């Protein structure tokens, strides 16, 4: 542990120099309008460092606050975070879920009573099967949503107990219900109409998805909205995610030619 700390101290000037080089490469843009974050690897990080599950989610929670600030400082307008999947919401132990929910609540309270959301005028929304969330968490979430509902400069969307397939199924059910009531005709249904039935009809398509931990998959994340997204996978666990990892993702995005399926 001592050697590791000494190594970090020695390498810190090199890191800051590289950070400056990266920023100079990307600072003139273009920047993605909507960034999706899959913050993966908290538990594996804890195992690798002989730490507890609580330590894992606490460190992941702190990192998310940091990354959110980086994105806002860069001028990113829309940020969506995959906080908890439907699969994990159903399969994780009650103890682990309570730990996750407690940190989500703590994060929302920091946003509600802190300055960052109001400084950048960030609208905060949640999507997913949020009825599965504890009542105290729902209360804070509702307060924050209400407090920021008129902000329109930035948007933070939290996907909690969320699954992309489930969202599409739920949208389809709503369309069928409206069709049976005579509110919609089959010939009227297109992509724009279908979007109106998603959890958040105003949520824009994602330009760049960033996933940590080295896993190369999307894990049922916003399937409708990432049809033409650029994907970037980082070989580091979420608690160790660095600013240079974010900037490398942005640099990769800037170098790609987006053809939107054409």
From Swiss-Prot:
PANTHER family membership: DEHYDRODOLICHYL DIPHOSPHATE SYNTHASE COMPLEX SUBUNIT DHDDS, DEHYDRODOLICHYL DIPHOSPHATE SYNTHASE FAMILY MEMBER
Active site, renumbered: 40, 88 (proton acceptor)
Reaction(s) catalysed (UniProt annotation): geranylgeranyl diphosphate + 7 isopentenyl diphosphate = tri-trans,hepta-cis-undecaprenyl diphosphate + 7 diphosphate
Cofactor details (free text): Binds 2 magnesium ions per subunit.
Residue numbers binding Mg(2+): 40, 230
Function: Catalyzes the sequential condensation of isopentenyl diphosphate (IPP) with geranylgeranyl diphosphate (GGPP) to yield (2Z,6Z,10Z,14Z,18Z,22Z,26Z,30E,34E,38E)-undecaprenyl diphosphate (tritrans,heptacis-UPP). It is probably the precursor of glycosyl carrier lipids.
Subunit structure comment from the entry: Homodimer.
EC number: 2.5.1.89
Gene field: uppS
Record's keyword terms, sorted: Magnesium, Metal-binding, Transferase
Residues in coiled coil: none
Residues given in the record as substrate binding sites: 41-45, 85-87, 92, 211, 217-219
Cofactor list: Mg(2+)
Name this protein carries in UniProt: Tritrans,polycis-undecaprenyl-diphosphate synthase (geranylgeranyl-diphosphate specific)
GO BP, sorted A to Z: polyprenol biosynthetic process
